[in-house]
Design a protein with these regions (language model features):
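Structural hallmark of WD40 beta-propellers
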Residues: 37-41, 50, 59-61, 78-83, ...
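Conserved strand-to-loop turn within each blade of WD40 beta-propeller repeats
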Residues: 1-2, 43-46, 84-88, 127-130, ...
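WD40-repeat beta-propellers
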Residues: 5-9, 43, 49-53, 72, ...
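WD40/WD-repeat beta-propeller blade N-cap
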Residues: 21-28, 63-69, 106-112, 155-162, ...
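Loop/turn segments within WD40 beta-propeller blades
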Residues: 31-37, 73-79, 109, 116-122, ...
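WD40/WD-repeat beta-propeller blade-loop signature
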Residues: 17, 27, 36, 59, ...
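A structural motif specific to WD40 beta-propellers
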Residues: 16-19, 58-61, 102-103, 151-153, ...
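Blade-level signature of beta-propeller repeat domains, shared across WD40, Kelch, NHL, RCC1
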Residues: 255-277
Length: 277
């Protein structure tokens, strides 16, 4: 909320703060590493997305919008393009080489909550805040990237919004964190059906923007919870395999280490970050 991005040295017991970036003029909403790890992409309440060369500590590009930018996502195969979504419900595909919008995705949506590319990068999934009247049509939409059209807009008919969508690293499914206190499962190929017989439940959302993430091998799903706990689910059985009491306030995100499979990091509504082994 203080406009700052911190890069932390996970293993250092002394100099844990490796770098501090101050390029935004308002609170930061989302931060993503580029696939090669040389750049950081960040967005926020100043209605911009900013690309920073981490090694040089220099801002290389600014992408301006007429909305608070809430979520950003690099393309899985082409790090020169990324998606952005914001408070006005606008979704844009940007090219970092030109600094211009390549595609616009418009459908009178509410604020965008999350974005996720499919495995081949030809489609993406959006989740947005919706009114009760159109919740079955717009809560989760699968889009065609190049044609700018929805491939399916009635994926999730429950009366809940979904603050997080995540693609499985290998299987043809994606999951959505539902405000109904469960993680729903969908096929990531047409016709994008909800699995009505299996879900991940046990954690509590309580209106917090709580995220979930798959392990690198796809065998586990981790979710935060409003009671400050981390829930680890078995992917196949959907059963809770471990519950860790991590924070005093809501645990809003959990991430697996990109190389070391038994290391996870979590963050809390109170601003604290923990690493578990």
């Amino acid at each position: 909320m203080d406009h700052t991005i911190f890069i932390w040295n996970v293993w250092s017991r002394n100099e844990k703060k490796a770098c501090m970036l101050n390029f935004h003029n308002a609170a930061v909403k989302d931060v993503k590493w580029s696939p090669q790890g040389h750049f950081l992409l960040s967005c926020g309440y100043d209605c911009t997305t900013r690309l920073v060369d981490v090694e040089k500590g220099l801002e290389t590009q600014v992408f301006r919008e007429d909305q608070i930018v809430a979520v950003i996502k690099f393309h899985p195969d082409n790090s020169n393009i990324f998606l952005s979504g914001g408070s006005n419900g606008h979704i844009k595909l940007w090219d970092v080489r030109t600094g211009k919008v390549v595609h616009n995705y418009n459908r009178n949506l509410g604020p965008i909550l999350d974005l996720e590319f499919t495995m081949n990068g030809k489609q993406f999934i959006s989740s947005c805040d919706v009114s009760q009247s159109n919740i079955s049509e717009n809560a989760i939409i699968v889009w065609d990237v190049s044609r700018e059209v929805p491939l399916s807009n009635q994926v999730y008919a429950e009366a809940y919004t979904c603050p997080c969508v995540r693609l499985h690293p290998f299987d043809s499914i994606f999951v959505a964190q539902s405000n109904g206190n469960y993680v729903a499962i969908f096929t990531s190929t047409p016709p994008y059906r909800l699995n009505k017989y299996k879900r991940y439940e046990g954690h509590v959302i309580s209106g917090f923007p709580i995220k979930c993430n798959f392990s690198l091998d796809g065998k586990k799903l981790a979710s935060g919870s409003s009671d400050g706990s981390i829930f680890l689910y078995d992917y196949q059985s959907s059963k809770v395999v471990k519950k860790i009491k991590a924070h005093d306030q809501a645990c809003i995100d959990v991430a697996f280490h990109p190389i070391i499979p038994n290391v996870i990091a979590s963050c809390s509504w109170d601003g604290s970050i923990l690493v578990f082994e």
